[in-house]
């Protein structure tokens, strides 16, 4: 007769081990406290509580948008990725140490082994997600943010030899040229579909937006010469004629707009139209209150058409429809000037949707994916927190909107060699600049807000 080997019942012990491990997964040290091991409990809990306290304090002292802006700055982002990895290791050690309770010698049973493995996976997953999004953000910076030599690796209509322009001093206005690039398959060359100068006053906490007509001709280049064709072709023209524009098309366009307005253009931001659609979708769409119906049976492209229309009243628009609203100009009573006003309207709505209600945090993954392949800027990444604070603080009531229309420009007539164009009137432009580009801390003078779709 052979003796039968009896295996001990490890179920109750495994359950206790797992419960302690789960507690330490929630907060390192809790499992050790459950196991009545005070010294290990304090060793794991105190650093964890200090870290949580620092995070809580940061959220109390800063808005979520500001914190996010600080966090995604390249230097800070690299540090946070390292901290994330260290916290993961710390939590896993705490989980394993709580699971291996010395009061219960012997190997854990199947329940304990499988349970511990599942718990390790659950603890690791959020840290892996943080690393994925962090690495994605860092990759985006490399593609979008050009360094001092303009060496960003992505974005529309890249300039092989672009160079940065003059930079603002401390407390000075920051002037950014925003370019919407139309490089669709029907185009033989990329054109700037929209040109908007955005001027930030960091002292007075105000914003001035000036839309430049894309059909503007005879624009000064800032070197004594004049660009005779339409301004929306300068970017592509300069990039194809490197001998005449050795600094590239973007710098040529910055210099031209700066000379036109008589103000320095410090930075640029380029977004192609397909990327704009994706950006709007990434923040969940934008809210627009349409004052006059728009309709164009021939409009199409970027997921809309043929034909597009919109009725009077509030609308929540996705990316394709927001782009259509900003671009349509062949509707009754509409033209390039009313179109420019609608473009500013959509930009403000995009800003509102991105920063209000903490939506920016949830929109970040899609937004990063959108801008990574479709945008480029030489804005310094280390000033992102400052710009984020301005974007969050400055609403529509502190934004001055200008569309460069008559008397700042005049018609080129019916027989102009470049077709339907407008010609700048320097004196009137200078008068506008004096009113809305005031010294830092001085509010811009009153200017009639453009009404892109006034009620009939």
Kindly label every feature range from the protein language model:
Residues 12-51, 88:
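Hydrophobic, aromatic-rich membrane-embedded alpha-helical segments
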Residues 131-456:
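Non-catalytic, solvent-exposed segments at the cell envelope interface
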Residues 35, 39-48, 55-56, 64, ...:
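Membrane-interface alpha-helices
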Residues 47-102:
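Membrane-embedded alpha-helical segments of integral membrane proteins
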Residues 106-139:
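Internal/C-terminal transmembrane anchor helices
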Residues 31-38, 91-113:
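Cytoplasmic membrane-interface segments at the C-terminal ends of transmembrane helices
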Residues 13, 17, 37-40, 69-83, ...:
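Membrane-interface helix-boundary signature
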Residues 1-11:
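Short, Lys/Arg-rich, polar N-terminal cytosolic tail immediately upstream
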């Amino acid at each position: 007769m052979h003796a039968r080997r009896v295996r001990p019942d490890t179920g109750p012990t495994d359950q206790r081990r797992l419960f302690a491990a789960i507690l330490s997964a929630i907060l390192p040290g809790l499992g050790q406290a459950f196991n009545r091991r005070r010294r290990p409990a304090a060793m794991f809990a105190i650093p964890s509580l200090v870290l949580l306290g620092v995070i809580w304090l940061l959220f109390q002292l800063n808005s979520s948008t500001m914190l996010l802006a600080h966090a995604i700055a390249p230097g800070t982002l690299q540090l946070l990725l390292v901290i994330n990895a260290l916290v993961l290791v710390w939590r896993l050690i705490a989980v394993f140490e709580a699971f291996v309770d010395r009061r219960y010698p012997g190997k854990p049973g199947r329940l304990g082994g499988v349970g511990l493995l599942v718990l390790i996976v659950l603890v690791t997953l959020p840290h892996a997600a943080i690393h994925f999004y962090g690495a994605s953000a860092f990759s985006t910076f490399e593609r979008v943010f050009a360094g001092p030599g303009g060496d960003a690796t992505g974005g529309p209509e890249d300039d092989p030899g672009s160079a940065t322009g003059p930079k603002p001093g401390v407390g000075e206005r920051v002037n950014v040229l925003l370019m919407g690039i139309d490089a669709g398959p029907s185009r033989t060359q990329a054109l700037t579909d929209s040109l908007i100068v955005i001027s930030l006053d960091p002292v007075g906490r105000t914003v001035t937006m000036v839309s430049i007509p894309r059909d503007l001709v005879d624009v000064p280049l800032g070197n004594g010469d004049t660009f005779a064709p339409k301004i929306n072709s300068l970017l592509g023209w300069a990039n194809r004629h490197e001998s005449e524009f050795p600094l590239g098309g973007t710098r040529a366009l910055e210099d031209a707009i700066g000379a036109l307005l008589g103000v320095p253009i410090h930075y640029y931001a380029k977004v192609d139209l397909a990327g704009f659609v994706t950006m709007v979708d990434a923040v969940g769409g934008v809210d627009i209150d349409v004052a006059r119906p728009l309709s164009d049976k021939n409009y199409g492209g970027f997921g809309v058409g043929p034909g597009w229309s919109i009725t009077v009243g509030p609308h929540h628009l996705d990316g394709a429809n927001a782009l259509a609203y900003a671009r349509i100009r062949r509707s009754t009573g509409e033209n390039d000037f009313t179109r420019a006003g609608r473009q500013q309207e959509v930009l403000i709505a995009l800003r509102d949707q991105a920063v209000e209600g903490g939506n920016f945090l949830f929109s970040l993954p899609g937004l990063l994916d959108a801008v990574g392949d479709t945008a480029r800027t030489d804005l310094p990444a280390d000033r992102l927190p400052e710009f984020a604070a301005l974007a969050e603080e400055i609403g529509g009531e502190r934004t001055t909107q200008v569309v460069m229309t008559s008397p700042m420009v005049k018609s080129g007539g019916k027989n102009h060699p470049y077709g339907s164009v407008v010609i700048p009137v320097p004196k009137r432009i200078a008068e506008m600049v004096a009113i809305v580009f005031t010294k830092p801390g001085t509010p811009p003078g009153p200017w009639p807000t453009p009404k892109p779709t006034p009620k009939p």
